[in-house]
A protein has these predicted regions:
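Extracytoplasmic
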Residues: 1-168
């Protein structure tokens, strides 16, 4: 039986902080965290297509805050906001948010539903990004019809030691 690193019933702050750190980090920093914890799959809940506001992206700031409590030198909440102090998800999103694994998993291929254009994110009443964020360390394994459930498989390390982005 496989264990779950973190779920809604987790009361152990370091576990939640670790999941938050992986999701808040750029792929190249998130991948070693996922591998260190033997993660095979990553599940996210995305309500942008259906208008479900209880999704992971809306809960993401809590993950960031909890992670910042353990890693204040690495995770900084203010970097996820725009220069005007807003939590925006479209092309106006901060570079830190756009580079995060969470953002990439959320919006990967989303604009394909809208003919390659920025699609409407109904959960945040905002446009999504105009281009699909690329993923180098995860493969999309499953996306439900309404895009509410998305599952990604963590890629296995390259046998030749190359970066996954170079080994594709």
């Amino acid at each position: 039986a496989r264990t779950t690193l973190d779920d809604p019933h987790t009361r152990h702050t370091p576990h939640t902080a670790t999941v938050g750190k992986a999701r808040a980090s750029p792929e190249e920093r998130a991948y070693p965290i996922l591998r260190q914890h033997d993660v095979d799959y990553v599940l996210i809940i995305f309500g942008g297509l259906l208008g479900y506001s209880g999704d992971d992206l809306n809960k993401f700031l809590w993950m960031i805050r909890i992670s910042q409590g353990l890693w204040p030198d690495e995770i900084k909440e203010h970097k996820f906001f725009t220069s005007s102090g807003e939590y925006r998800v479209a092309d106006e999103a901060s570079p830190t948010l756009r580079d995060s694994l969470m953002y990439k998993m959320t919006y990967h291929r989303y604009n394909e539903l809208f003919g390659g254009q920025a699609g409407m994110d109904r959960a945040r009443n905002s446009r999504g990004p105009s281009t699909s964020p690329p993923l180098a360390t995860l493969d999309e394994g499953f996306t439900s019809d309404g895009w509410l459930v998305r599952v990604y498989q963590v890629k296995i390390e390259d046998a030749l030691g190359r970066a996954l982005s170079a080994a594709q």
